[in-house]
Amino acid sequence: MLGLGVDRLQADINRLLASLFHQGVLDEQFLQLQQLQDETSPNFVYDVINIYFDESEKLLRNLRLLLMDREFSDYKKIGLHLNQLVGSSSSIGARRVRNVCVAFRSASELSNRPGCLRGLEVVEHEYHYLKNMMHELFQLEQQRILAAGVRYPM
């Protein structure tokens, strides 16, 4: 009986991941991240993604503060924050976040304040979408683990 619930949850996980890949939210780097997870580190992906979210929140907050300062003119500082966000997004396979960061960085290289404000808005939107989808994925995975039951080595 437990197997049916586990199978249904695994199918839900597979559908969600397929959708995220189809939408371009994730890329193959996310699959490589998943392959690093094993029995010795069963929470590896969850931990790495949560570190990404914690660090990204700081970067987004810094970008927002910089752009809210009407006297701001140091667009190189914006570029540095965006480079960090591009790198960390690439490392976890957050394709759409990475892509919109690259577009935002182009606006900062042109010292285009309206373009930067719009870029920040788009990055925040994509970031929050990714965060919500990862939360949903991790909830499904947790339910699948619980449905499978605890197995003790014999």
From Swiss-Prot:
It comes from Arabidopsis thaliana (Mouse-ear cress). Gene3D superfamilies: HPT domain. The keyword Acetylation applies. This is Pseudo histidine-containing phosphotransfer protein 6. GO terms for biological process: cytokinin-activated signaling pathway; phosphorelay signal transduction system; response to cytokinin; xylem development. Keywords: Acetylation, Cytokinin signaling pathway, Cytoplasm, Nucleus, Two-component regulatory system. Functions as a two-component phosphorelay mediator between cytokinin sensor histidine kinases and response regulators (B-type ARRs). Plays an important role in propagating cytokinin signal transduction. The lineage of its organism: Eukaryota, Viridiplantae, Streptophyta, Embryophyta, Tracheophyta. Residues 41-137 form the HPt domain. GO terms for molecular function: protein histidine kinase binding. It is found in: Cytoplasm, Cytosol; Nucleus. Interacts with AHK5. Its main location: cytoplasm. The modification N-acetylmethionine is found at residue 1. SUPFAM superfamilies: Histidine-containing phosphotransfer domain, HPT domain. The keyword Transmembrane does not apply.
